């Protein structure tokens, strides 16, 4: 997990969860369970789901993305053609990207989405 958090800026989002019968269930967050190849692992084991800010995007319409989580914007950081969106979901801070033309404000409720191939199970050796 150290390497996943150490490399890249901004840091990789690390979302705590547990193995469940339908995949990884995220602690304290309203989100669909994330499909996983941990089906053979005892349910309830702790695991982290890592997703880089470059891969976590603000959705402005209905989406078929595998990972979707509702959050509230705390900070917006303009970066030219894109903006970094610092949002809170449950007790966890997440960093995502959005197009700089998007009309986003502090306090807005947003849906953050990512493709399945952008999700990384971290700490599986400890599961």
Model-derived regions: residue spans:
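Short beta-strands and strand-coil junctions in structured, solvent-facing domains, enriched
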Residues: 2, 56-58, 94
């Amino acid at each position: 997990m150290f390497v996943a958090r150490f490399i890249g800026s901004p840091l990789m989002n690390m979302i705590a969860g547990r193995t469940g019968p339908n995949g990884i269930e995220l602690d304290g967050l309203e989100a669909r369970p994330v499909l996983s190849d941990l089906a053979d692992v005892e349910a309830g084991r702790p695991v982290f789901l890592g997703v880089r800010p470059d891969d976590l995007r603000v959705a402005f319409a209905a989406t078929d993305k595998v990972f979707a989580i509702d959050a509230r914007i705390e900070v917006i950081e303009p970066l030219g053609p894109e903006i970094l969106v610092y949002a809170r979901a449950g007790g966890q801070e997440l960093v995502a990207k959005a197009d700089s033309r998007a009309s986003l404000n502090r306090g807005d409720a947003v849906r953050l989405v990512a493709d399945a191939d952008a999700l990384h199970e971290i700490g599986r050796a400890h599961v």
